[in-house]
Design a protein with these regions (language model features):
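Juxtamembrane intracellular "pre-TM" segments in multi-pass secondary transporters
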Residues: 1-16, 197
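Short amphipathic helix-loop junctions that connect adjacent transmembrane helices
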Residues: 33-50
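Structural signature of the two symmetry-related core transmembrane helices
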Residues: 81-96, 173-176
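Intracellular juxtamembrane helix-capping segments at the cytosolic ends
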Residues: 119-132
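Pair of pore-lining "gating" transmembrane helices in MFS-fold secondary transporters
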Residues: 9-30, 111
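Paired small-residue
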Residues: 93, 104-112
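Residue-level signature of mid-helix packing/kink "hotspots" within the transmembrane helices
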Residues: 60-68, 152-153
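Helix-to-loop junctions at the C-terminal end of transmembrane segments
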Residues: 65-78, 163
Length: 197
């Protein structure tokens, strides 16, 4: 009972929940607009559909390939450093996506964005595990999973609202600002400072 009531840094854990949500949010925010966006550059229906599928898959493929290496890097240099760098990388890679001049340009940009996010979920899990009592780890990680599903819901909603109100390119820029804020919060975290980032 004493262990269950042991104090821990809730601000750190909440920041990790937010980050977990935004990792999914960043990938899903373009879903409502991607087909129309690509349709500005391609004119055959089958080509638009195929390219849309490839673009959505590119980020996931990048994450699959980079996750083992990012996880290994985090073990060596620290989870906070890798987390902050990955979030900043994602934010930066969203900017050129708003200014493409041909549909194929989205493929390498989404792939690189996926690579920057690959392995960050294990970083989040490790940070949570190191900051909560052992008897509460399961519950806190459960909330982290719920946060990811919130990102899966809020990402497309956000993209749809922004795209409907201001157009498709601002979806990428607005997502960039959200990810940049999360990266800044992670970088400025007292625990990250204490660990030398």
């Amino acid at each position: 009972l004493g262990e269950a009531a042991a104090p821990f840094d809730r601000a750190i854990v909440r920041l990790m929940w937010l980050t977990a949500m935004l990792l999914v949010f960043a990938n899903m925010s373009i879903e409502p607009v991607i087909t129309l966006y690509i349709g500005q550059f391609l004119h055959q229906e089958h080509a638009i559909i195929l390219m849309s599928g490839l673009v959505m898959a590119a980020a996931a493929l990048g994450s699959i390939l980079s996750a083992p290496f990012v996880g290994k890097l985090a073990d060596r240099v620290g989870h906070w450093r890798v987390l902050s760098a990955g979030l900043f990388g994602c934010a930066l890679l969203l900017i050129p996506q708003a200014f493409i001049t041909d549909a194929w340009q989205l493929l390498p940009l989404r792939f690189l964005m996926g690579m920057s996010l690959g392995g960050l979920m294990p970083c989040i899990t490790a940070i949570i595990r190191h900051n909560v009592p052992a008897v509460q780890v399961g519950r806190m990680l459960g909330y982290s999973t719920s946060a990811q599903y919130i990102g899966q819901v809020s990402g497309p909603l956000f993209g749809g609202v922004i795209g409907g109100a201001w157009g498709m390119r601002p979806v990428f820029l607005a997502t960039c600002m959200v990810m940049g804020l999360c990266a800044w919060l992670s970088w400025r975290s007292p625990r990250a400072k204490a660990q030398g980032r």
